[in-house]
């Protein structure tokens, strides 16, 4: 029987690449969700015939409802953030893949876990903003949390030898360096969104591409790695690997290092999360070592790229510190993409929010959303 998948965020970059994998493996789509891209999800409905679809924007839901009216075999339509959580919690799928962008994915991640579903997680913000809540829920409900980020998938793959994993001493978390690698503050001052959206190696959505340019993405991934693999941040070293061939590595107590390599294609980690623990042929070409002329490794420049420094401060503060950093960044990136602030303002604002409070202590889901709201308000008040 074909594996059934609920795919949240199906019209984004990760979502469409996930459907490439689902198509190639002959999996069944149980549910799909999108925010507002009605035309795109209509095409997906016609090909994959999901039983349920959720549109989280009101306008998108109204447009999709009109398009599906009277259509034979149309999926049941759910709407809004509550509809997204309902879809994530529904009985039926074998795996829920959450590729929603931003903190909007947290509630759906928790709903899937609490309903007993294995969760393939591309929404790193679930762990960044609510890592304590997510890991606690995973332990309570005994489900698998399968990383989809290429770096965390690489680390996860390197740790499959459970005996060796007990001797883990360090994670080498790789970064591409983004489009502005090697530049200093003065060179970055006039960079536009068009400049920042030119990633050298990866095909990604706008928000994560900007995060790559500021190195915020690597800061978020550092926080994510702390929650996924149980190492303190000082045991996670960020290494710039410009070719995006070495996706990350782990170091053991005897100082041996195991790395995962492959072409820079997100369908590899997506497929591994969906087929785990099996490995099967897929749609990605093999890496030809004879064509690799150079693999370089460099230090990440935290002095210039302040988002990375801010994320390190945030995870060391603990509590809601990472949530505050994430909320500030989401708001700042939105303003940057609207041409309302400059590129360097993103790092300035994220760091200012992290420095504004101690953020320590336990927290609830309501606390997470309130912290996110306050961080965004802080950004808007300090432009």
Walk through the language-model features, giving the residues of each.
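Catalytic, metal-anchored helix/loop core of enzyme active sites in primary metabolism
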Residues: 1-383
């Amino acid at each position: 029987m074909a594996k059934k998948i609920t795919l949240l965020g199906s019209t984004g970059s990760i979502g469409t690449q996930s459907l490439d994998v689902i198509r190639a493996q002959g999996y069944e789509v149980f549910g799909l969700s999108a925010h507002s891209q009605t035309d795109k999800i209509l095409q997906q409905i016609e090909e994959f015939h999901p039983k349920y679809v959720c549109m989280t924007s009101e306008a998108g839901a109204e447009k999709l409802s009109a398009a599906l009216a009277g259509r034979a075999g149309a999926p049941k339509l759910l709407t809004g953030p509550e509809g997204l959580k309902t879809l994530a919690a529904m009985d039926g799928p074998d795996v829920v893949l959450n590729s929603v962008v931003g903190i909007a994915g947290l509630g759906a991640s928790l709903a899937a876990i609490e309903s007993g579903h294995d969760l393939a997680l591309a929404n790193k913000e679930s762990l960044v903003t609510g890592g304590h809540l997510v890991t606690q829920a995973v332990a309570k409900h005994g489900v698998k949390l399968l990383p989809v980020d290429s770096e965390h998938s690489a680390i996860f793959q390197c740790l499959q030898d459970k005996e060796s994993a007990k001797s883990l001493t360090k994670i080498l978390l790789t970064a591409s360096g983004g489009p502005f690698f090697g530049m200093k503050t003065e060179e970055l001052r006039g960079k536009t969104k068009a400049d920042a959206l030119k990633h050298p190696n990866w095909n990604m959505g706008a928000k994560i591409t900007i995060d790559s340019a500021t190195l915020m993405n690597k800061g978020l991934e550092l926080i994510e790695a702390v929650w996924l693999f149980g190492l303190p941040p000082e045991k996670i070293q960020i290494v710039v690997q410009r070719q995006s061939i070495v996706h990350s590595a782990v170091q053991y107590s005897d100082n041996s290092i195991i790395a995962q390599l492959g072409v820079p294609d997100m369908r590899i980690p997506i497929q591994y999360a969906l087929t785990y623990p099996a490995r099967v042929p897929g749609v990605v070409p093999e890496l030809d070592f004879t064509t690799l002329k150079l693999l370089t490794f460099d230090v990440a420049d935290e002095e210039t790229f302040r988002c990375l420094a801010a994320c390190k401060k945030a995870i060391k503060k603990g509590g809601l510190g990472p949530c505050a950093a994430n909320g500030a960044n989401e708001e700042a990136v939105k303003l940057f993409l609207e041409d309302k602030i400059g590129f360097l303002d993103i790092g300035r604002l994220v760091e200012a929010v992290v420095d504004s409070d101690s953020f320590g202590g336990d927290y609830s889901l309501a606390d997470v959303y309130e912290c996110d709201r306050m961080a965004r308000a802080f950004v808007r008040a300090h432009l």
